[in-house]
């Protein structure tokens, strides 16, 4: 048991070192096109690490210490909502399974999460797309809103097991254009009426 624990710890240390090195390369590449993320006037402090749990997602970015200069107040009826569009501390976590992929795919994931640290880029809206487009054009990345796990595994010469529907999912949804499957526990009629496939924009249908 101790040997297994030591082996897993060593593997995680190797992944962590690789992650830090690739992050440094991303920082240098951004600097080469005029984006200095070490400039605290532009962006807050960024810390990057492996995710503690091996989640299905590629990575995530958590924010702390909101910048009062970027405070946004919106009103809806009698209610007032406060949001912040810049944070002084940002914490990026990358899933361990991502670290098994090609370096270019790992860097693409890192760059995606770095963009979320920029002001007004908490979501995948206009500002996120602007930065992603600029980075893709000038550095040859492929930063997008969604990743394609199956294709990324193939590019990395790794076997990918296509997930099948399980008892946890009541509804199986298929894109009529590209054939991708999505699984949901609940069904809303607006899903097929107003939503489209995140990969190709095709219409969705419920499979029986």
Q: Language-model segments: which ranges?
A:
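Walker B catalytic acidic pair
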Residues: 113
């Amino acid at each position: 048991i101790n040997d297994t624990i030591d082996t897993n710890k060593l593997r995680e240390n190797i992944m962590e070192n690789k992650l830090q090195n690739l992050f440094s390369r991303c920082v240098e590449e951004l600097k080469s096109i005029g984006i200095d993320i070490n400039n605290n006037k532009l962006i807050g402090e960024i810390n990057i690490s492996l995710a503690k749990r091996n989640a299905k997602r590629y990575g995530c970015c958590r924010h702390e210490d909101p910048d009062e200069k970027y405070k946004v107040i919106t009103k809806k009826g009698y209610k007032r909502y406060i949001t912040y569009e810049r944070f002084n501390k940002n914490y990026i976590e990358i899933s361990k399974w991502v670290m098994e992929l090609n370096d270019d795919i790992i860097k693409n994931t890192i760059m995606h999460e770095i963009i979320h640290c920029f002001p007004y880029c908490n979501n995948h809206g206009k500002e996120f797309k602007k930065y992603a487009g600029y980075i893709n054009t000038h550095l040859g990345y492929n930063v997008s809103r969604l990743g394609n796990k199956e294709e990324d595994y193939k590019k990395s010469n790794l076997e990918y097991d296509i997930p099948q529907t399980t008892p946890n999912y009541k509804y199986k949804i298929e894109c009529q254009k590209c054939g991708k499957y999505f699984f949901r526990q609940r069904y809303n009629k607006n899903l097929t009426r107003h939503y489209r496939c995140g990969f190709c924009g095709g219409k969705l249908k419920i499979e029986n």
